[in-house]
């Protein structure tokens, strides 16, 4: 941000096409160049192999290797405090805009719906928005499995209450 202590943030979450060296919004989409004249802090986690197939959510149960996926916890609780402590970006309600691509779209839609007091805007591109539809739920589960994750570890067996709680179409009124 141009102004020190400015709480305005744009957080960009990648899709499957990301890698471990950079965020696709920066190196593939020049988001930092687009936002250069705006007084905002760009937060674009390099998620790569760490996120591909996770949909930036907290998994309901550990994976077979004992690993627990907690992207939502990181993005909502840990990252804001890290930014505050190390970059002097204050934690304020309605001060973060979310942008997501593909898998990142599912993540940002859920963040915005589950924590509406935190986020001011959402730009979601090419995601799964109706997880109550068998085809979209199957595609999401297949994407997770292709990346080596156990889809049932995410939100349980489809169509559980957790799947419904993370369905952007069913939860549209939360915005």
Please give the residue ranges for each predicted region:
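Non-catalytic cap/lid and distal C-terminal segments of serine-dependent acyl enzymes
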Residues: 1-175
């Amino acid at each position: 941000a141009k102004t020190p202590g400015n709480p305005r943030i744009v957080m960009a979450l990648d899709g499957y096409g990301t890698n471990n060296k950079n965020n696709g919004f920066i190196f593939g989409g020049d988001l930092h160049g687009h936002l250069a004249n705006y007084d905002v802090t760009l937060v674009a986690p390099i998620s790569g192999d760490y996120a591909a197939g996770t949909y930036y959510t907290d998994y309901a149960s550990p994976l077979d290797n004992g690993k627990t996926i907690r992207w939502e916890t990181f993005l909502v609780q840990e990252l804001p405090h890290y930014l505050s402590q190390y970059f002097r970006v204050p934690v304020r309600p309605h001060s973060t805009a979310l942008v997501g691509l593909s898998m990142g779209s599912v993540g940002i839609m859920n963040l915005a719906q589950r924590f509406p007091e935190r986020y001011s805007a959402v730009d979601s591109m090419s995601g799964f928005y109706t997880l109550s539809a068998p085809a979209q739920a199957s595609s999401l589960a297949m994407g997770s499995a292709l990346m080596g994750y156990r889809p049932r570890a995410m939100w349980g067996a489809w169509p559980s209450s957790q799947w419904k709680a993370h369905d952007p179409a069913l939860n549209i009124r939360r915005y």
